Amino acid sequence: MNEKEKAELHEIQTDLANYLYNNYRIYTKNKEKSEEIKKKYNRGNGSITEKEYLQKMKSIREYSDINKIEFTSFSVGPMNSLDVEFIINDVYPDYTILGTISAETGKFRYSFNTGNTINNYVLERKENSSTEKMPEKNIIYTNKGVE
């Protein structure tokens, strides 16, 4: 991998980390409280309504801002896309497929599978995004190149 390719991968990692940092967060639920609420709801046959069940389940979410991203690999996908694997906050491994470049910015468009539970955490889009830069020390770059 030459210096130009290294610089391009570094820029992709920085942009992707900042995008996640500004637009997403993760949450987990207290397992005991979740089980207690499920018992009370009992698939619609319990002592609380569906609306109450949904409200209670949402209220026990424990949110965490994204404060660390570790990039683990880059590979070329079956459709010549760039597949990027990373770990958020040391607990949420995920990946994205970069295959579309924005006509406006000339950079990759990012998309993520929100709502998936991985290691008891869920990635969720923030209600209000920001434009801050993630501290460089919190981005763990991979320099292995594209596999």
Kindly label every feature range from the protein language model.
Residues 93-119:
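A short, surface-exposed beta-strand/turn
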Residues 53, 73, 93-95, 135-145:
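Aromatic-enriched hydrophobic runs in primary sequence
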Residues 26-29, 43, 88, 97, ...:
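Intrinsically disordered, low-complexity regions enriched in small/polar residues
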Residues 112-147:
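C-terminal partner/receptor-binding element of secreted or periplasmic proteins
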Residues 60-101:
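Exposed beta-strand-loop-beta-strand "reactive/processing" segments of non-cytosolic proteins
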Residues 25, 30, 47, 101, ...:
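A generic structural signal for solvent-exposed, polar alpha-helical segments
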Residues 1-75:
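N-terminal export/targeting and maturation segments
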